[in-house]
Amino acid sequence: MATPGPRSRGRRHDERLYPDMILCVPVTSDGQVDPRWGRADRVAVADVVDGEIAAWQEIEVSWSRLHDEGAPGSHHARVVRFLREHQVEIVVANHIGDGMVRMLATMSLPAHLGAVGSARAAVLEAAS
């Protein structure tokens, strides 16, 4: 989902509409916000343009299984890699643990917490 070349936020560039904002939310199979950010099985990466979801990609991350695997810190490193690869600018979640909050702060990534219900609605609320 990485965009080629420089992005013109919310504007057409080379006949492509680039997002105003890229957000990530943990999502259940029925489209609700999964209350577990760091242990989510699936997340959605959403491109928001002019207050509307222009693209929605759900990705199996299996963080529930991977959370306790590997050396200390490897799970946070995995999440950082995912967020950077997908150029995420805001994390939308119900709750995030203290360690993950610190990690997001070091990345200067804001977290919109307390999200419940429809994952798409939560993304739009966070983007507004």
Question: How would you label these PLM feature ranges?
Answer:
Residues 2-78, 85, 105, 111-128:
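Non-catalytic interface/targeting segments
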Residues 73, 93-94:
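Short alpha-helix boundary/capping motifs
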